Amino acid sequence: MNRPVGTATRGTTNPNRLRRMDRWIAHAHGPALRRSDPAPVAVDLGYGAAPWTAVELLRRLRTADPRCEVVGIEIAPARVAAAEPYEREGLTFRHGGFEVPTAERPALIRAANVLRQYDEDEVAAVWARLCDRLAPGGLLVEGTCDEIGRRHVWVALGPEGPRTVTFATRLGSLERPSDLAERLPKALIHRNVPGEPVHAFLRDFDRAWAAAAPYASLGARQRWIKAVADLAGAWPLTDDRRRWRQGEVTVEWAALAPSRG
C-alpha cells in the first residue's frame, strides 16, 4: 500500500466551523452537482480530530442534491478510526492524503485549514495535484477560517486552476474588512504587503467600509452591502447582493493573484 501524500495537521476542529464555506459551495456548485452522472462524490480532505465537518458537509450538500455522497479523508489513521462509528448511508471515512484515494473522481474536494500549515512554495503543487483528481466540472475549495467559523477566506479552483477568492464573515464581529487578512489562505497570506494585489484590495475595501459608515445606523449588513457595491466599481466581483447579504464577497482570482517574484 502506498504511503499517503502529505503530513498530519494539528487536527483542530469544531462543530459548525465550516458553515459559511458549506453554504457557499451548496449555492455556487449546486447546479454542477445536480448535473453529475453518476451521483456526485465530495471529499472532506483533512477533516481533523473529529468528523463533525464531514457529517455537516453531507447534510448541507444534500440540500443541493440528495444523491451526494461524502468521503472524509485523513492522513492520521487514529482519526479515521475515531470517525468510523459516524459512518452512515452516503458518508464514509478513509485513510489518505493529497492523492485523494477515492474510486471515483470527486465532484468536490474541500480542504479547509490544511494548507495553512504548509509552506507557501508548496501550495501550487498541491493545488495541481488535487485539481488533477477532480471529475469534469469538479471544484476544489481551499481556505482558512478561525476556530469557530466567524471569519473565512477561500479559493475556488476548477480543473484548469484557481478561479475566485471568497471573503466571508459574521458581520457583527467585524471592525473593518481587513480583519479578514489573518484568515487569508496560504497562497495569499504572506502577500498582504504593499505592492501586492490582495493588499490593494483590502486597502480599498477598508476605504469603502469607512465611506459607508453612515449606513451603520441601519446595521452591519447594510453597511457591508454598500461598501461592497462601491468596491464593485474598481474590482471584478463575481457575486451579487444576495450573497453580499450573507456577509460574503467573491473576487476573480486573477485580480488578487500574487505578483511574480
Locate each region found by the language model:
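Class I SAM-dependent methyltransferase Rossmann-like catalytic core
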Residues: M1-P40, D44, A49-P51
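A conserved mid-domain beta-alpha-beta active-site/ligand-binding segment of alpha/beta enzyme cores
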Residues: V153-R223
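A short glycine-rich, Lys/Arg-flanked "PGG" loop and its adjoining helix->strand segment in the class I
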Residues: R116, A124-P136
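A short SAM/SAH-binding and catalytic strip from SAM-dependent methyltransferases
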Residues: P106-A124
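Conserved Class I S-adenosyl-L-methionine
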Residues: H199-G261
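Conserved beta-strand signature within the Rossmann-like core of class I S-adenosyl-L-methionine
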Residues: L134-G149
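Class I SAM-dependent methyltransferase SAM/SAH-binding core
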Residues: V43, G48-P101
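A general structural motif
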Residues: D37-A39, R67, R105-P106, G137
